[in-house]
Amino acid sequence: MMRIQSNTDPRIVLLRNKEVVQWLFGDLSFLPPIEKKNKTVDNQKYKILEDEWGRRITHMRRPDLKLDKQWTTKFGEHICEELCLLQGKTFSKPAKKINYQPDCESDDAILEVKTETFFTEGTAGEKILGCPFKYAEIPSLYQKPLRILCLGGAEKACREQYGNLEGEKCSPQKRAFLDFFKANGIEYVAVTDILKSLL
């Protein structure tokens, strides 16, 4: 993470933390060990540990926030901002247009951030697949392409289950949909791909 280490911008907080970078790449080995029982119980324990870690880490960047339950939204938005800074881009909260309030606007794109923990169960992440339809008007409203940034468990699910990011699950049929979205100014982006480009 050479570019991160050499960047002196004090607004880059989360991405300087080794555990954050590990988490983004799906390495949760920094979590404390648990007494193993079975997969269901173990995942419940890991979910608690992951949430405790996430709230603590997010609090480092935003000590003003009360993070009783949900931490992934703010965490993801701040990762997005820090990535913009590392790429030399300016960012801001975009103006609300019609009923849209995207997460971030950079020099060259509107950014919507989708973050999920690695131990979230169920189908909550499947909402990510509806983003191109939900936000179809954003590229024309803002005159910029929409990039849907997927990070953490969301990136893993998109790559390994849903196939809307590059990987074995991205079939030719799914690729055709992704090409259509891109032709209409909407693209899914894996945060780890951005991080790798910054090495």
PLM feature spans:
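Conserved catalytic cores of phosphodiester-cleaving nucleases, focusing on short active-site segments
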Residues: 104-117
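A generic structural signal for well-ordered alpha-helical segments
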Residues: 84-85, 139, 181-182
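Acidic-basic catalytic patches of nuclease active cores, encompassing PD-(D/E)XK
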Residues: 1-93
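Catalytic cores of nucleic-acid endonucleases
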Residues: 115-169
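Domain-level recognition of nuclease-like catalytic cores that cleave nucleotide substrates
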Residues: 147-199
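Residue-level marker for well-ordered alpha-helical positions
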Residues: 74, 78, 132, 172-175
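A structural preference for short, hydrophobic beta-strand core positions in alpha/beta folds
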Residues: 91-94, 188-190
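Beta-rich catalytic cores
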Residues: 100
